[in-house]
Amino acid sequence: MKILWSKIRRTGLWAALPAIPLAALLAWLFFAPCRAPLEGVSFSGVILDNTGAPLRVSLSRDQKYRIHTRLTDIPRAAVEAVLRYEDRHFYSHPGVNPFSLFRAALSMLGGGRRMGGSTITMQVVRLSHNLETGKPGAKLRQMLLALQLEWHFSKDEILEAYFNLAPYGGNIEGLGAAALVYFHKTPAQLTQAESAALMLVPQNPVKRRPSQDNPVFAAAVKRLDQAWSGRTEHAPLRIYGPQDLPFEAPHICAELLERHRDGGVLRTTLSPTLQKRVEGGLRAFASRNAAYGLKNAAALVVHWPSMEIRALAGSADFHDARISGEIDGTRARRSPGSTLKPLIYALALDQGIIHPHTLLLDTPRSFAGYDPENFDGSFRGPVSAAEALRSSRNVPALTLAARLKHPGLYEFLRRADVEFLSGEEHYGL
């Protein structure tokens, strides 16, 4: 080691030693793997009706309200306001702004007001890597990762990540989720006052969480308005909370969220007005017929020309555990019962086994140990095929099913792509 150091001094290579750390840093920036700022981030599922209004908003896998929002979907005025408030030199620095850091350090050492020296890029690093940056070592790592992030990704990609990760109080992250939760709007629909109010939150999301009765938040909004010479609107803000998020069309929304566990925005063909009419109609129908033992009902409304589902109510009351209201009756498996009888008669007609006036016996009969009865508990003896079908007699239908040639009822259903059929022997006939 002494010989090597002697050669370095003798040849003058010592002058190049300061360049080695810089070269190592450049090599690390260029060659070290750098994950995308939103890689591995989970998002909420948002179900919309056919007008674009939200029906349901779910939590992300890590229990956050976080809605993926593209930078192009955020108004330019809102972007410029955030840059002005958070990082004026975002588009000119390499990820770290030494002047801001120096100014923040001087203010802190001088006992003045604590100032933030972190750039938007540094904030994205802290949020995406879940860093605690209170210690010097962690702050240095944050700065290095910010430089690396700027090396590998564009400014717009980093800014988009910020708008998806910034904290807005509680478990609400990102401007898209904040706009929806607090104002029931998309970012593009926010007023100037609403955008300005949300812009204040990420710097102190605990104390500045938006609510109608948060004095810290109200004071921050007032100070911003004064600082901007009254350019923000003065109309009082109507602020909502997570408890006010919509919970509409619960059965179909639950099904869609189960299918799309990675989140994202899904637009359905549901009509909000028709959906409410169907739900109200089912509740009224079940109430009117409760005396007859009817406790529950389900309905599916399909627009025939387009085959689009316009309304779906899986039960009379989703929240009523007594009727298992959370179970979707439109999807629950159950016996088709008498709905198969017209198919049996149609096949028998096609195969020349009967005509409408063919007499069929409606009398007690056993089919491999099964003794069918009729809904009225009686048998009518000889009846025409037309009358047997019209009055839904069971023995004539089973007799015809046994007489069918090719295709039989089972083969007919299989050709029609009826799902979940068991083997033919399972059904006996």
Residue ranges and their predicted role:
Residues 183, 214, 420-429:
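Active-site-proximal helix/loop microenvironment
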Residues 66-71, 317-331:
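A short, polar/charged loop-to-alpha-helix boundary motif
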Residues 42-44, 296-299:
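Short loop/turn microsegments at loop-to-beta-strand junctions
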Residues 91-100, 173-176, 323, 349-367, ...:
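Short, well-structured active-site flanking segments
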Residues 2-291, 308-310, 363:
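Juxtamembrane regions of bacterial inner-membrane/periplasmic proteins
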Residues 81-83, 278, 306-307, 328-360, ...:
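Active-site SXXK
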Residues 107-134, 247, 251, 255-258, ...:
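Conserved catalytic neighborhood of penicillin-recognizing serine enzymes
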Residues 126-130, 164-171, 188, 192-204, ...:
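Glycine-rich, acidic and aromatic/proline-enriched surface loops and short helix-turn segments
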